Amino acid sequence: MDINKPGWNQSDQQATAYDPNQQQYYGDGSTYYDPDQAVDPNQAYYPDPNTYPDAAAYYGYGQDGQAYPQDYAQDPNQAYYADPNAYQDPNAYTDPNAYVDPNAYQDPNAYVDPNNYTDPNAYYGYGQDGQAYPQDYAQDPNQAYYAYVDPNAYQDPNAYTDPYYVTSTDHNAYYGQVDNVPALEASDLAYEVTPQEQAAEQELFSEPETKVIREIHEFPFEKIRSYFQTDFDSYNSRLTQLKDKLDNAIFSMRKAIDTVKENSANLQIMKQNFERQLKEQQTQRLTSNTDAEKIGAKINQLEERMQRLSRTMESVEWTKKEPRQEQFDPRFVDPRNFNNYVNNTDTMMSMFEKVLMMNLLRSTTPVQPPVQYFTPQPLTASPRPVYEEPISASFRRRGYRGDEFYE
């Protein structure tokens, strides 16, 4: 959006005073507003809850100089964290399908609700398809093996039980056993074989591949020969086809050369005829001397005009570097000037305009960008930087402690 808009704007259809000391932007596309009045430094820091929320929340400036709302990077002049005393509506709706930016900044010091904590390092297994998925039925082997089961919970006698999903009250039972009774074989998904384990298994238990060692007379020479023979045959046929094509091409080229020779001979004869006719006409022309003088004067006059025109064209030539397609409304085109807008042709009028424009360009400076004014904002305390200890993979630099190092 252009920040150098004049006061009167066609889309607004209303006059607004243009104050160069203010940055004026479009809010909803229809009215101006002033973002500098968004924060009054003399007011309390949090907005008055009884007022309508400010439509001109903090705006940042993009690479292209456009203003856009930075909801995700808050105003650095505001307090860094949200107001801890702000009222939280317990019944507020949270969209479970809302998009979560995986690259969003996570504050390491953010408060974690102990009743709503999900461990990001929870144990994940890999399925047959290589996808990671939470293994609720085969829990982290480093944890207690079974989750706590309430013995007094109501058991539905008709409920479907998955034979692979073993829930046992016996916490010492093996997986796949209920109260030490062998159950059905556990599913493949209950455990995973790592590639290292697979490799070790291969090394320990696999047998070497049997290699058939042939005697020399057992090799199928005839098969090999016939296999290559088919190749040679196909190449041979393709080469003969190519040769035929080339022969045809040479023949047609020779024909073409002959016809060209014939035509050039005919043209030579025609040229001689024309020259003869021209000489005959010249002898008939310019009977009197005055005609020649008149024609000479006319030629001189034309030459002068050509020189003058060529000088003008040289000074104008830079305008024709890139022919551009003019965008114009035919209703507003001056009919006398119409040729300027068609095909980029040069009329006397357009040439006159170009020379005028050049003189104007010589006598004026280019448009300067407007000055930008910034209103000062009060600075608030920013979080103190944390310096990490540098990693030094080296000897200790301050002498040797005791006799633990000998040169």
From Swiss-Prot:
Topology in membrane: Peripheral membrane protein
The UniProt entry, under SUPFAM superfamilies, shows: Trimeric LpxA-like enzymes
* Residue numbers spanned by region Disordered: 1-50
Q: What is its main location?
A: membrane
> Where are the annotated sequence repeats, by residue?
40-45, 75-80, 83-87, 89-93, 95-99, 101-105, 107-111, 119-123, 140-145, 150-154, 156-160, 170-174
Q: Does the keyword Transmembrane helix apply?
A: no
Which stretches does UniProt call biased (Polar residues)? Answer: 7-25
Q: How is it modified after translation?
A: The N-terminus is blocked.
Q: Name its cellular compartments.
A: Cell membrane
Q: Which UniProt keywords apply?
A: Cell membrane, Membrane, Repeat
- A GO-annotated cellular component: plasma membrane
**Residue segments, region 12 X 5 AA repeats of D-P-N-Q-A-Y:** 40-174
InterPro entries noted in UniProt = Trimer_LpxA-like_sf
The organism's superkingdom is given as: Bacteria
Q: What is known of its domains?
A: The penta/hexapeptides repeats form a proline-rich acidic domain. In addition, a part of this region contains a perfect direct repeat.
Designated name of the protein: Proline-rich P65 protein
Q: Which organism is it from?
A: Mycoplasmoides pneumoniae (strain ATCC 15531 / DSM 23978 / CIP 103766 / NBRC 14401 / NCTC 10119 / FH)
